[in-house]
A protein has these predicted regions:
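N-terminal export/assembly segments and adjacent metallocofactor-ligating motifs
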Residues: 1-227, 499-501, 505, 520-524, ...
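A cross-kingdom feature strongest in bacterial/archaeal respiratory oxidoreductases
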Residues: 3-7, 29-32, 157-161, 169-196, ...
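Glycine-rich phosphate/diphosphate-binding loops that line cofactor/substrate pockets in enzymes
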Residues: 83-100, 149-157, 233-248, 272, ...
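Conserved short loop/turn motifs at secondary-structure junctions
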Residues: 100-109, 252-257, 322-325
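A generic structural motif
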Residues: 125-137, 184-193, 273-287, 341-349
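Short alpha-helices
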Residues: 192-193, 199-229, 253, 261, ...
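Internal, active-site/partner-interface "lid" segment
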Residues: 227-232, 400-416
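A glycine-rich, hydrophobic/aromatic-adjacent loop/helix-cap motif
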Residues: 247-311
Length: 554
C-alpha cells in the first residue's frame, strides 16, 4: 500500500487528502494509475479544508478509475518518443495562424502551464486559451484572480452570495459561510429561487423576480441572459441604501459566465465599497492565468478559437488535459470535422481523444510533481514526483529544459519563494498591474412585451422555461455518478405549476429542447418560481441561465 498526500482537482479550492493505493503494479507499472484498490483518508491538517471533502472528493477513486489514454499515432500504439517526434514534426507543417493550443487548468500545474505557454511561444501562435481570456476586457487580473484566505470569509460581518449556491457549487465554501453566520455575520443570498439547502443560514434572500421582474420575464421572450439580469439586479441593490456596504461578495467565474455578469458583480462591489472573491471551477485557474500575465501572453477567447476551428481557419489543435466535449466548450464531434490534425495529451481517455491523430499519455494529478495556485492565492503541491508532462511539452517545443529549470522560471514569474501551504500565497498585484476598470453597468432599453398573443404564441410560451444550471464539480468533468451507482440521465427541478401544465406523473421523463437539440431528463418537484427549472447536471453546454422549450417525453 502506498500513500499520496495530494489535492482534489474538482474545483478551485484544492482540498487536501490522502490517497491510499495498492502497491501492486498494473499494466505499464506505476504509470498505470487506477482507482481500483484505491481509498481515501481525510487529511485533517490540510490548510484548505481541514480534512473535510465534498461528494466529488469522496469519489476520487472512481474518478481515477477511468480508462488510461494510450500513446498512439493514427490509432496505432507507439512509444512516447515516437509520438512526441511525430507531433513536433507535424506542427511545423502548419502556418502559425492555423494552429491553436487549449488547456483548461484543472489538472495542469504551474510548471506544466509554463512549459505549455513556452510551446505556444515557440510556435509563434496567438491562438491559445486557458479558458478565461474573454474576461480580460472586463477587469484587470488583480480583480479577476485576486485570492483571499477562506479564514476571511469566516471573519466577514456581511456576506453576499451573488447568484452562487455554495452548497452545490463549492460545498467546502459553504462550511466557511456557516462559521461566519455562527460568528454573527449577516448572510444575504441574491438568487432566482429560495435555497432549500440553506434554511437557517441565510438571513435574507433577494429574488431577482421581485426587484427586476421585467428583465426576468423578458428572458422568456426577448433573449435576455444572465448578464442582463445581473446588471439590473446590481443597479437595484446599489440603490437600496447602506445595508450591503462593506460586504464580502462571492460570485462564480467560469467559462460560461457572461461578461456582463462579471461586470455587474464588480460594479456592485465597487459601489458598495465591498470586497469580492471570484470562485472558479478549475483547480489552477488562478495560477495558470497569472502565469500567462507575467509572461505577457494574453491569448484569445476560447469560443473565438472554437469558431475558427468550425470555420476551418484553424486546422491544427493541441489539447493539454482538456476535453472540449465536457469542459464547457459547447462543441460536439461535428465541429472538429474541418481539423486536419489533432493532438491530445492527457492522463485518461476522453470523448475527444477518439478524434485525435496523436494521443500522448501523461500522469494523473496525484502522481505529478508540481504546484498550483488555488482561489485563495494559496500555493499547493500536487503531491507526486512524476515530471513526464513537463518533459513531453519541453521535447515538443524543442526547449528541453530540465524540470528544475522550468520550475524555477514558473516560481520566479509567480513570486513563489517557498512551498508551504500554510504560508505561501501569490499576490496578483505584483504580477499584473491593473489598467482596466469594470465596465459601467447601464440601463438597457426595454422593448416591452405585447399584451395580446396568438394562440400559437401562448402555447409556445407555456412550454418556454428558464433553465438555471448550477455548475457543481461534476458539471465540468467527463464523469458523473450518484453516491454509489452511475447514472446517465440528468435531473432537473421543476415547479408544481409546470408539472400540472405538462400533466406529469412520477417516473415520467421530460424532453428539453434548445438550439435544435433535445435531451430526455428526469425531474423532481421543488418550490421554485413557475418560470424556472434548476439542474446541478449538465443539460446544455451553452450557458448558465438559458431559455429552453420543454414538454413531456413521448
Amino acid at each position: 500500500m502506498k500513500a499520496y498526500s495530494t489535492i482534489c482537482p474538482g474545483c478551485g479550492l484544492g482540498c487536501g487528502l490522502y490517497l491510499l493505493r495498492d502497491s501492486e503494479k498494473g499494466e505499464g507499472g506505476e504509470r498505470a494509475a487506477t482507482g481500483k484498490g484505491m481509498s481515501i483518508l481525510h487529511r485533517k491538517q490540510s490548510a484548505v479544508n481541514a480534512g473535510k471533502l465534498c461528494k466529488f472528493g469522496m469519489q476520487l477513486p472512481h474518478f481515477y478509475s477511468r480508462e488510461r489514454l494510450r500513446t498512439a499515432v493514427g490509432g496505432k500504439n507507439v512509444s512516447e518518443e515516437e509520438a512526441v517526434k511525430e507531433a513536433r514534426e507535424r506542427l511545423t507543417t502548419f502556418r502559425r495562424e492555423e494552429i491553436a493550443f487549449l488547456a483548461m487548468p484543472s489538472t495542469v500545474t504551474n510548471e506544466e502551464a509554463l512549459a505549455f505557454l513556452s510551446l505556444v511561444s515557440e510556435v509563434g501562435s496567438e491562438n491559445f486559451s486557458l479558458g478565461f481570456e474573454r474576461f480580460f476586457s472586463v477587469a484587470d487580473f488583480g480583480i479577476l484572480f485576486r485570492g483571499m484566505p477562506l479564514e476571511e470569509v469566516e471573519r466577514a460581518e456581511k456576506v453576499l452570495l451573488f447568484f452562487l449556491d455554495p452548497f452545490v457549487q463549492y460545498p467546502l465554501l459553504a462550511r466557511r459561510i456557516l462559521r461566519a453566520k455562527q460568528r454573527g455575520a449577516h448572510v444575504v443570498d441574491v438568487s432566482f429561487a429560495e435555497n432549500e439547502r440553506a434554511k437557517g443560514i441565510y438571513d435574507e434572500t433577494i429574488l431577482a423576480e421581485e426587484i427586476v421582474g421585467d428583465f426576468v420575464k423578458d428572458m422568456l421572450s426577448e433573449g435576455e441572459d444572465l448578464g442582463d439580469v445581473a446588471s439590473a439586479v446590481a443597479r437595484a441593490l446599489v440603490g437600496g441604501g447602506e445595508k450591503l456596504e462593506n460586504s464580502l461578495i462571492l460570485a462564480d467565474l467560469n467559462l460560461l459566465s457572461p461578461t456582463d455578469f462579471i461586470s455587474a458583480a464588480i460594479f456592485l462591489a465597487e459601489e458598495t465599497k465591498s470586497q469580492i472573491l471570484f470562485m472558479k471551477p478549475f483547480l489552477n485557474a488562478n495560477g495558470a492565468n497569472l502565469l500567462s500575465a507575467a509572461m505577457n501572453m494574453r491569448g484569445r477567447d476560447i469560443f473565438e478559437i472554437l469558431n475558427d476551428v468550425e470555420r476551418g481557419k484553424i486546422k491544427c489543435l493541441f489539447l493539454l488535459e482538456t476535453d472540449l466535449l465536457y469542459d464547457g466548450g459547447g462543441v460536439d464531434g461535428t465541429a472538429l470535422e474541418n481539423l486536419e490534425f489533432l493532438v491530445v495529451q492527457n492522463a485518461f481517455k476522453s470523448a475527444i481523444s477518439e478524434f485525435a491523430d496523436i494521443t500522448i499519455c501523461s500522469e494523473p494529478l496525484f502522481l505529478k510533481k508540481g504546484t498550483v495556485v488555488n482561489v485563495e492565492g494559496r500555493v499547493l503541491s500536487a503531491g507526486g514526483d512524476a515530471q513526464r508532462t513537463v518533459e513531453i511539452l519541453e521535447r515538443i517545443s524543442g526547449a528541453e529544459r530540465t524540470y528544475k529549470q522550468v520550475q524555477e522560471e514558473a516560481w520566479k514569474h509567480l513570486g513563489i519563494s517557498k512551498l508551504n501551504e500554510y504560508e505561501s500565497f501569490v499576490a496578483p498585484a505584483s504580477i499584473a498591474s491593473g489598467k482596466k476598470r469594470a465596465r459601467k453597468v447601464t440601463n438597457k432599453e426595454k422593448k416591452g412585451v405585447g399584451a395580446e398573443k396568438s394562440e400559437e404564441e401562448a402555447r409556445k410560451d407555456a412550454l418556454t422555461q428558464l433553465l438555471w444550471q448550477k455548475t457543481s464539480p461534476f458539471f465540468w468533468h467527463a464523469w458523473q455518478t450518484t453516491r454509489r451507482t452511475k447514472r446517465s440521465e440528468a435531473i432537473v427541478e421543476i415547479s408544481p405549476s409546470l408539472a400540472r401544465r405538462l400533466n406529469l406523473f412520477k417516473g415520467e421523463m421530460l424532453e428539453i429542447r434548445r438550439g435544435g437539440e433535445s435531451r430526455r431528463v428526469a425531474f423532481r418537484i421543488a418550490e421554485i418560481p413557475s418560470y424556472l427549472m434548476i439542474s446541478t447536471d449538465k443539460v446544455t453546454k451553452d450557458g448558465i441561465l438559458v431559455r429552453v422549450e420543454v414538454e413531456k417525453a413521448k
